[in-house]
């Protein structure tokens, strides 16, 4: 995150970038289907742009934003999970996202 001007200094964010060996539309269909998310998150889609961006709200008021871009060998998924309230929450979200992305990668690589 570039500049926290106007933000509470206690608010944290998490950034993760993952490459997938499939087209962006396939990853978009998985990320855009909240039924395929980890159950513990209880996501609600707030906004999306076809095959490129999804913004989600979670019950703790944190906000994951996924951006997809096409790469020569597939696509890149960038996650900016913003408005995280504590270092512990950020650690937990990092574990959740890394496990889910690993699961999605395994699924699309079959």
Predicted regions and their residues:
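Short, surface-exposed coil-to-beta transition loops
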Residues: 13-15, 60-65
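A conserved amphipathic terminal alpha-helix motif
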Residues: 1-3, 83-110
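Hydrophobic ligand-binding cavity/cleft-lining segments
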Residues: 1-42
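Short, hydrophobic/aromatic-rich segments at coil-to-beta transitions
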Residues: 47-57
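Short, well-ordered beta-strand elements
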Residues: 75-82
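Short, surface-exposed beta-strand-loop junctions and turns on beta-sheet-rich folds
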Residues: 35, 62-63, 83-85
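Hydrophobic/aromatic beta-strand elements that line small-molecule binding cavities or substrate pockets
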Residues: 43-45, 62-70
């Amino acid at each position: 995150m570039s500049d926290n001007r106007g933000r509470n200094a206690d608010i944290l964010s998490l950034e993760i970038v993952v490459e997938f060996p499939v087209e962006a539309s396939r990853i978009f269909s998985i990320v855009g289907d909240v039924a395929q998310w980890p159950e513990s998150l209880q996501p609600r889609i707030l906004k999306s742009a076809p095959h490129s961006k999804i913004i989600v709200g979670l019950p703790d008021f944190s906000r994951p934003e996924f951006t997809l871009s096409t790469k020569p060998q597939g696509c890149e998924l960038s996650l900016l999970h913003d408005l995280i309230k504590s270092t512990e929450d950020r650690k937990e979200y990092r574990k959740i996202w890394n496990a889910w992305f690993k699961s999605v990668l395994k699924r699309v690589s079959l």
